[in-house]
Amino acid sequence: MTQDNSQAKAKAPAKSARRRARELALQGLYQWLLNRNDPGVVEAHLQDAQGFNKADRAHFDALLHGAIREETTLTEAFTPYLDRPVAELSPVERAALLVGAYELVHCVDIPYKVVINEAVELTKTFGGVEGYKYVNGVLDKLATQVRAVEVAARR
């Protein structure tokens, strides 16, 4: 006897436009980290991706181009919280850290816990088995530096 589990399975909530923007930015940063292609070429490639038209375009542009433009500064900001050299990070972890660091520094309208959670979810989706824990720890420590008042108020 079989049972229909279609109703028992919870339907995944629709992705928000910002989540799609983060996913696409992460994918673009991944490509850029591996190939160092011109950001315009990376963006053009992503425009053909499924769901691009449903992404928050302004947020995507800010994340992709901002993280590439400020890669050195953002990397310097989170490097003190790494337990290994930046070169040993997986490209997905590094891209997630760049997205998260950029949002922590520049998107102060987004609560730091949301920024960290979104980076963790990106890493769970695209990264290795335990990579999300690492990204969580690094961004949590970075948040205490760049959003000290907000972190202190929430703890």
Swiss-Prot record:
SUPFAM superfamilies: NusB-like. GO terms for cellular component: cytosol. GO terms for biological process: DNA-templated transcription termination; transcription antitermination. Involved in transcription antitermination. Required for transcription of ribosomal RNA (rRNA) genes. Binds specifically to the boxA antiterminator sequence of the ribosomal RNA (rrn) operons. InterPro entries: NusB-like_sf, NusB_fam, NusB_RsmB_TIM44. The gene is nusB. This is Transcription antitermination protein NusB. Gene3D superfamilies: NusB-like (1.10.940.10). Pfam families: NusB. Keywords: RNA-binding, Transcription, Transcription antitermination, Transcription regulation. One of its GO terms (molecular function) is RNA binding. It comes from the Bacteria. The keyword RNA-binding applies. It comes from Ralstonia pickettii (strain 12J). Belongs to the NusB family. HAMAP family: NusB.
